[in-house]
A protein has these predicted regions:
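N-terminal positive-inside, membrane-proximal cytosolic segments immediately preceding the first
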Residues: 1-7
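Hydrophobic membrane-insertion alpha-helices, especially the h-region
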Residues: 8-22
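Alpha-helical transmembrane signal-anchor/signal-peptide segments
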Residues: 27-44
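Short N-proximal segments of mature Sec-exported proteins
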Residues: 45, 61-72
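Short helix-adjacent coil turns
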Residues: 45-58, 96, 100-107
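Short, charged, amphipathic alpha-helical segments
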Residues: 56-64, 83-91, 109-114
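Short, solvent-exposed, charged loop/turn and helix-capping segments
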Residues: 67-88
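Non-cytosolic head/periplasmic domains of membrane-anchored proteins
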Residues: 95-134
Length: 134
């Protein structure tokens, strides 16, 4: 009887560790993908205002793709992350999109910085640390 309890406890512990590891990997991979896309977007006001319309349309398409990737993954992410971190990323993505499409580039750059910080925080919160464990 005691052996059975040890085996069941061990199996549950392995499943728990596997689940936590998968969540950390998933959040890390999605956040890294989004950060790579954001770093490819323009980051200087002087550069943006001098862009030709075709290049602006290309960046709009990239921002739409970023939004689609977030939408596709957000349902899973909201289950495993802190709500405040999730909402910060969500809000920054929509702000980034709206300000760029409205040609309000100074606000777009602010939202871009917020989004980078929010994604990095979300990514770091999934790493094993004393704070996350206790």
């Amino acid at each position: 009887m005691r052996n059975k309890s040890v085996i069941i406890s061990s199996a549950l512990m392995v499943m728990l560790i596997a689940s936590i590891s998968f969540n950390a990997y998933y959040i890390n991979s999605v956040s890294t993908e989004l950060l790579d896309m954001i770093f490819a977007l323009p980051s200087e006001y002087e550069y943006i205002v001098k862009l030709e319309q075709s290049k602006l349309e290309e960046f709009k398409s990239d921002i739409n793709t970023l939004s689609v990737i977030w939408e596709k993954n957000s349902r899973r992410i909201c289950i495993v992350t802190r709500y405040s971190d999730f909402e910060r990323v969500n809000s920054a993505i929509y702000g980034l999109r709206e300000y760029f499409f409205a040609a309000n580039y100074s606000q777009y750059l602010t939202e871009r910085k917020k989004l980078i910080a929010a994604l990095e925080k979300q990514k770091n919160n999934e790493l094993p640390s004393f704070e996350n464990i206790f």
